[in-house]
């Protein structure tokens, strides 16, 4: 039997194994003008809804998969649930990375919601991620803060990992500040450095894994859109000014970030390859959140706290672990709190002009 999937006796199979998701993959070498190998049409064995879709749009325009994310109505329901329970109307959303959740603890006059109490919300399972959505004031500015995010390695599709960004958008946030803990792939970096993200390489997207896969809802944004200057250059420039003001300019970097699937750390060969591609920091988050935010038209600012140096030689002893990563974040909480507070203040000031 061919290694490619085709319809046989009404079932899609690959090497004799039915597809677990129940959807049928189609290939031109198995069909001619929409005719299946068994003599019927390519749509005969599909669910009725798919057959109806094919009848109006043709056999080669049938949905490939169901959307793995949330519908607009479901996300609107989440946003409404939250807005009915807080008087705050934030314009800035913040995502706290591993060990950086204490940023949310600097908010005042808070309304907080555990993820498990919010309808349709996933639950964070990683140490260092509290799993709480917090509304409050940071430097006198209303914000909403994710105290813990969702990762692909927890078993969530990327669309679900990035779902809270769309909720932020529906609540009224125009800006996203994303933070993460990352490994330094640039040998000039040091543990404790803050790297402003000027660009990213979407490696998971190279493999066809994107948070926007599936049907597009124009109410969020267009099907196709550009990603140049995704990380707002003006905010990055202002961040450098702020770093000088609070005396951390020597610890501030600017570079390229990439996201791997995790949960394992990178091999030496992988780090060498990514360094050759121009990657300065490696993590397991952020990229899909930023893509989703840009799709919604949000302005993005992001930075990585370098919590470990990637292992770049087989002679090195691999010392980094998740506990030490969380520890670095806690050691830098005061500095990062001041840094983010001033960024938020600047965003608020610029919006009032």
Curated annotation (Swiss-Prot):
Region (Disordered): 1-42
Binding site residues for a purine D-ribonucleoside: 266, 308
Record EC number: 2.4.2.1
GO biological process: purine ribonucleoside salvage
Pathway: Purine metabolism; purine nucleoside salvage
Keywords: Glycosyltransferase, Purine salvage, Transferase
Catalytic reaction equation(s): inosine + phosphate = alpha-D-ribose 1-phosphate + hypoxanthine; guanosine + phosphate = alpha-D-ribose 1-phosphate + guanine; 2'-deoxyguanosine + phosphate = 2-deoxy-alpha-D-ribose 1-phosphate + guanine; 2'-deoxyinosine + phosphate = 2-deoxy-alpha-D-ribose 1-phosphate + hypoxanthine
Gene3D superfamilies, alphabetized: Nucleoside phosphorylase domain
Subunit structure: Homotrimer.
UniProt record similarity statement: Belongs to the PNP/MTAP phosphorylase family.
Name by which UniProt lists this protein: Purine nucleoside phosphorylase
Organism taxonomic ancestry: Eukaryota, Metazoa, Ecdysozoa, Arthropoda, Hexapoda
């Amino acid at each position: 039997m061919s290694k490619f999937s085709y319809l046989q006796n009404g079932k899609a199979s690959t090497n004799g194994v039915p597809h677990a998701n129940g959807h049928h993959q189609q290939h031109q070498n198995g069909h001619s003008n929409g005719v299946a190998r068994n003599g019927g049409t390519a749509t005969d064995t599909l669910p009725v809804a798919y057959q109806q879709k094919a009848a109006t749009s043709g056999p080669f325009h049938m949905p490939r998969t169901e959307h793995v994310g949330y519908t607009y109505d479901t996300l609107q329901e989440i946003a409404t649930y939250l807005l009915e329970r807080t008087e705050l109307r934030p314009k800035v959303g913040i995502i706290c990375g591993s060990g950086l959740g204490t940023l949310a603890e600097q908010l005042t006059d808070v309304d907080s919601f555990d993820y498990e109490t919010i309808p349709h919300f996933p639950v964070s399972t990683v140490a260092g991620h509290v799993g709480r959505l917090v509304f409050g004031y940071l430097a006198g500015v209303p914000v909403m803060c994710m105290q813990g995010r969702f990762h692909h390695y927890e078993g969530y599709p990327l669309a679900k990992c990035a779902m809270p960004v769309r909720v932020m958008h529906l609540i009224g946030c125009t800006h996203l500040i994303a933070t993460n803990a990352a490994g330094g792939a640039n040998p000039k970096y040091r543990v404790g450095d803050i790297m402003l993200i000027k660009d990213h390489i979407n490696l998971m997207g190279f493999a066809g894994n994107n948070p926007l896969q599936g049907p597009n809802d124009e109410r969020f944004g267009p099907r196709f859109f550009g990603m140049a200057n995704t990380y707002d250059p003006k905010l990055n420039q202002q961040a450098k000014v702020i770093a000088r003001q609070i005396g951390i300019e020597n610890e501030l970097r600017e570079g390229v970030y990439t996201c791997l699937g995790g949960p394992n750390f990178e091999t030496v060969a992988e780090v060498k390859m990514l360094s050759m591609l121009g990657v300065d920091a490696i993590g397991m988050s952020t990229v899909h959140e930023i893509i989703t935010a840009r799709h919604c038209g949000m302005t993005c600012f992001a930075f990585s706290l370098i919590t470990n140096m990637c292992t770049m030689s087989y002679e090195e002893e691999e010392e980094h672990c998740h506990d030490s990563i969380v520890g670095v974040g806690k050691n830098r909480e005061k500095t990062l709190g001041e840094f983010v507070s001033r960024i938020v203040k600047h965003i608020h000031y610029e919006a009032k002009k």
